[in-house]
């Protein structure tokens, strides 16, 4: 009642929205009903394959699953329900050369390791972690003796999809964030300017 005394004019907040809907992530295999033994077994198999490669000192494997249920209900008769399921996985191998102190890491399926998508456990099996584990480990070891990239002012390079997405994110996404534009960004890595 008190706030009504301060009203100068009616406020138009737009047309009444009466949306009704339900959405669920398309999932073929619910990751939450897959046995823990199956998930752990897959990670252990990938772990074993990576550890077979001489020169690999540390390996990592991970899976993550998210189920998020949301419901929006308004006083204007809107009712929207959604269930989002995410599934993700990844492996990484670290190789070291004790004589030079060089350390190299390769990961799969992304440069940062895990790839997470809105799908079910079928995504995990499609990644073929165990089948790619030895290759990932061998690439980590190969990087220890690989020649350094030449440093030219300009050169053509080929990036696959996930690395290109990361480059666009870092080169275009971060620079247009307002805190960076204004020079006020600060993080663990320091400040922009």
Residue ranges and their predicted role:
Residues 1-193:
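Active-site bordering "gate/hinge" segments
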């Amino acid at each position: 009642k008190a706030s009504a005394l301060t009203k100068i004019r009616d406020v138009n907040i737009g047309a009444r929205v009466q949306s009704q809907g339900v959405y669920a992530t398309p999932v073929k295999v619910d990751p939450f009903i897959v046995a823990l033994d199956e998930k752990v077994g897959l990670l252990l198999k990938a772990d074993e394959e990576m550890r077979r490669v001489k020169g690999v000192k540390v390996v990592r494997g991970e899976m993550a699953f998210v189920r998020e249920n949301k419901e929006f209900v308004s006083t204007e008769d809107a009712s929207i329900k959604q269930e989002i399921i995410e599934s993700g996985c990844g492996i990484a191998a670290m190789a070291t050369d004790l004589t030079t102190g060089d350390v190299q890491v390769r990961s799969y399926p992304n440069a940062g390791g895990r790839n997470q998508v809105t799908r079910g456990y079928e995504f995990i099996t499609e990644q073929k972690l165990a089948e790619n584990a030895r290759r990932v480990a061998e690439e980590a070891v190969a990087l220890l003796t690989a020649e350094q990239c030449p440093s030219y002012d300009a050169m053509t390079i080929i990036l696959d999809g996930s690395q290109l997405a990361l480059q666009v994110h870092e080169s275009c996404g971060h620079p247009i964030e307002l805190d960076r534009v204004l020079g006020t960004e600060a993080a663990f890595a320091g400040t922009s300017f």
